[in-house]
């Protein structure tokens, strides 16, 4: 029997804050994949070095080196895991900037699977996820429908330790379910594309 292909996931965090709970979710997802999901690897893709989108920086169809490197990582990924807080009912400015850079011709997001997770107060970042889904329509991203993952990071008992490490086992299991759904959709889409 042929070995299952390795699904390469690009993990993007909408928060640039060092102690971000959303970055904590990405770190936990990487650990979960390493420990308990065969055939799936997550690479954290740092969006903080990207300049603000400015088409004056595009020269003869090329982009600044940091943007070219980012676009290459997005292009090489089989799918995406977005972790973003909610800012004013939307995704963060840095995440939107990264999305915009990778959507410049040619759009390197297209026809790939994606999942979203978010941690925050109140609704746990849910409205940012719904806005990201709307943006994904234009990008031809295919988001998993279920399970949805919104985490009220401030609700007791604590979900993260003082270093931003996810410690809550139930939350880890919910995150694992998202990853398995993402893996299944990515494999399905790869099968259609190859």
Swiss-Prot record:
It is an enzyme of class 1 (oxidoreductase). It catalyses: a quinone + NADH + H(+) = a quinol + NAD(+); a quinone + NADPH + H(+) = a quinol + NADP(+). InterPro entries: Flavoprotein-like_sf, FMN_Rdtase-like_dom, NAD(P)H-dep_reductase. It comes from the Eukaryota. Its cofactor is FMN. The keyword Hydrolase does not apply. The keyword NADP applies. One of its GO terms (molecular function) is NADPH dehydrogenase (quinone) activity. Its EC number is 1.6.5.2. GO terms for cellular component: cytosol. Keywords: Flavoprotein, FMN, NAD, NADP, Oxidoreductase. Induction: By P.infestans. Disulfide bonds: none annotated. The enzyme apparently serves as a quinone reductase in connection with conjugation reactions of hydroquinones involved in detoxification pathways. Belongs to the SsuE family. Homotetramer. This is NAD(P)H:quinone oxidoreductase.
